[in-house]
Amino acid sequence: MGGLIAAGYLDRFGSLGRVAKVASLATPFNGSFEAVLKIAVGTGDLGGEAPSSREREAARMLPALYHLIPAIPGAVQAGPGLSSDLFQASAWQRRVVETIAEFVRFHGLRPVAPMEQAERLFSAMLCEARAFRGRVDELQLERAGLKPSDWLCVAGVNSPTRVRLPIRGQNGEVEFLLRSGDRENRWDSNRCPAGRDREQGLTGDGTVPFEGAVPKFLGRENVVCVTPQDFGYWEIADRVLDRAAGFHGILPNMNMIHRLIVRHFTGSPDLHGATWGRAAPGVPPGHWNPAVRLLRNKDVKG
């Protein structure tokens, strides 16, 4: 979420923010479906596996989690008469508001009409989240004195990740269909960018879908994609954690990314070919333009 905070800061303060360069790792600029799972059922790749009523209550009362709601074109597939806009309260299951109402009833300073208070509070959290995300989407780097080459944007790929959310109506209630088949990984490491079409964007780091990690203030050609296979030979513990806990949480530990960040902030050359990355799906050959100059394209053999 740090990348979202940095983008919000730059939008608010512009060139007064005194920022020269930024690096963001697996930031859900367009959201993550794991935030929906955490709010809806109390589980997901943003935390532990076993859902609990206490965890659901905490998630539903946490404003920051609503800032991670996904807004990816075509990814929320709503049934007839239902909204696909998850920043609208009507798109959500009623029990979310009911949980907030119970919290107000037990812990509110004025526990009068808790359901009405809960509806206002839920709508307010969604509206604030939508407004913030809108400001991030409309960020203009030049207003902050920056160029695309000043922002290193790293996205994790080649891990099964939830890339869509079907919504259906059931007995007058909204129902989120949380299906394992909606976790996909169509990334193909054997195909170079010339053959890697946008469909291979149906991947991610296990938590953030690739399409959720591409900010609107940068182009796809500016994104650096990394995979779990980029862990070094001796990063044995990190490889184990990747399999056990997912790529998203362990991605910042990758030695190669540390070297990449140092190169970005210092402008130092790569004398030994120790930093690399991959172009994003849909980027034509020769158009990859990452922030770090002369970054080795891992897709190009030899």
Enumerate the language-model features and the residues they cover.
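Gly/Ala-rich beta-loop-alpha elbow adjacent to hydrolase catalytic centers
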Residues: 1-2
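Hydrolases whose catalytic domains are alpha/beta-hydrolase-1, hotdog thioesterase
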Residues: 5-9
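Helical cap/lid subdomain of alpha/beta-hydrolase-fold lipid enzymes
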Residues: 11-302
